[in-house]
């Protein structure tokens, strides 16, 4: 069996031409529940340490903490263009680095969502994504589920998709983004013990089966009864990890490389070898 050269690889109509590398930083940290001002301050400090990265990714609900309850999440929820977004836009400009952060979003109709927002290095809001698959009583007690909206945006020549924590555990979500052209799927998370196998195994599997990069930014430490499992990572299309944190606070940086993605797609043609006519009924069950 012969393959086309990796440098010319196009799989399922997805080209790997363009800007060759991107530097992505993940900040793994213990949560500071209810301390928005304190979280903005440490974001500023971390962003100044990550100025050599093109993008800084923070955990799920970074601004407010995750396990904070309905009353607190209602009090701390903000609009997409709220005061915290304006502050983070200024931080992104000062650092010259795009920032993806998790926060409780209050929509114009009063619904509260578990959301992430991307602000570029010029301080412009590029994208807001709402968690679509809510996890257990914890999420269901605080948030409304996001609707059928899986945005794909371009940053520095790379196509980015977004998921939040539990979303990545449904393989259809990552595949949908990959088929739409995502080269990097960003996953702010608040993953806890005993689900650490997700950080260890699932993230690499999603990257490999979809032939794209997956960046997974988790908490460490604990929040009330929750013990977070750390292990933030950037998984490559070949299933390797180009950056990996342990169990403690860490700022890790990895370089995404289009050549590696092209080589991997030339060897593993999952996207073009699909037979969707065999799977149509699966999503209807």
Swiss-Prot record:
Active-site annotation: 60 (proton acceptor), 131 (proton donor), 165 (nucleophile)
- GO biological process entries: putrescine biosynthetic process from arginine
Give residue ranges for domain CN hydrolase.
22-258
GO MF terms listed in the record are: N-carbamoylputrescine amidase activity
**Top-level class of the enzyme under EC nomenclature:** hydrolase
Which EC number(s) does UniProt give? 3.5.-.-
Q: Which UniProt keywords apply?
A: Hydrolase
Question: Which SUPFAM superfamilies does the record cross-reference, listed alphabetically?
Answer: Carbon-nitrogen hydrolase
Keyword Hydrolase appears in the UniProt entry? yes
Recorded coiled-coil stretches:
none
Q: Give the InterPro entries listed for this entry.
A: Aliph_Amidase/BUP, C-N_Hydrolase, C-N_Hydrolase_sf, RamA-like, UPF0012_CS
The family line of this record is: Belongs to the carbon-nitrogen hydrolase superfamily. NIT1/NIT2 family.
**The protein's name in its UniProt record:** Hydrolase in pqqF 5'region
């Amino acid at each position: 069996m012969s393959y086309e050269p990796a440098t010319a690889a196009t799989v399922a109509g997805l080209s790997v031409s363009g800007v060759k590398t991107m530097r992505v930083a993940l900040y793994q940290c213990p949560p500071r529940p209810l301390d928005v001002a304190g979280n903005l301050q440490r974001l500023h400090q971390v962003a100044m340490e990550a100025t050599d990265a093109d993008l800084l990714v923070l955990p799920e609900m970074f601004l407010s903490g995750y396990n904070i309850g309905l009353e607190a999440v209602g009090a701390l929820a903000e609009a997409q263009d709220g005061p915290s977004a304006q502050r983070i836009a200024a931080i992104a400009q000062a650092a010259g680095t795009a920032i993806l952060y998790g926060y409780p979003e209050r929509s114009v109709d009063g619904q509260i969502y578990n959301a992430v927002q991307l602000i570029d290095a010029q301080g412009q809001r590029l994208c807001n994504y709402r968690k679509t698959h809510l996890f257990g009583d914890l999420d269901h007690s605080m948030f409304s589920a996001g609707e059928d909206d899986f945005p794909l945006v371009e940053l520095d020549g790379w196509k980015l998709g977004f998921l939040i924590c539990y979303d990545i555990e449904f393989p259809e979500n990552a595949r949908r983004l990959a088929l739409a052209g995502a080269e990097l799927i960003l996953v702010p998370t608040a993953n806890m013990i005993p689900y650490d196998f997700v950080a260890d195994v699932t993230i690499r599997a999603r990257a490999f089966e979809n032939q794209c990069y997956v960046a997974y930014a988790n908490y460490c430490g604990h929040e009330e009864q929750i013990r977070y499992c750390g292990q933030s990572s950037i998984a490559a299309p070949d299933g390797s990890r180009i950056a990996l944190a342990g169990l403690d606070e860490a700022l890790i940086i990895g370089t995404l490389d289009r050549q590696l993605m092209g080589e991997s797609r030339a060897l593993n043609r999952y996207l073009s070898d699909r037979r969707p006519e065999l799977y149509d009924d699966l999503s209807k069950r």
